Amino acid sequence: MNVKVESEKVGLKLNIQKMNIMASGPITSWEIDGETGETVSDFIFGGSKITEDGDCSHEIKRRFLLGGKVMTNLDSIFKSRDITLPSKVRLVKAMVFPVVMYRCESWTVKKAERRTIDAFGLWCWRRLLRVPWTARRSNQSTLKQISPGISLEGMMLKLKLQYFGHLMRRVDSLEKTLMLGGIEGRAGGEGDERG
């Protein structure tokens, strides 16, 4: 398939200077009409960072940075004595956690990242209470004062389960077939023999 020809059929004109590709194979360079395009190892698509190797740890770190930025922007509200603690907790749940959890349904969370998720949630609550990092205060006492109900990791798990339920309720979909292991074929490439 020629990308340029197919694009022109629907009235699109390609601008090579604005175009990048991320290849899953051995493509190192590409060109259209003699102009060479750039091959990248990662890019932002739909608000998420897509990497060549499919690892989501970069996206998780990126989401924590974005969530931390939102948390910092809310500092003036957290300092206000006119706003009650339950209202501040609801603000964090409504404005910070959704930024962090965006598209978390597709993440493969490892043990180290799970600890980081817990640490970020506790960092948010300690920042909300204005507890300095040097203070010798237990995480349990912080959680007891906030009483968040469900942890950040628990919220992420809930979203994953909701998405899984959505996929399982669909009648005929590729996603459901993949989840149920219904794709026939061999594992591995040419010459891969299993005894």
What are the roles of these predicted feature ranges?
Residues 1-195:
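Short linear motifs embedded in intrinsically disordered, charge-biased segments
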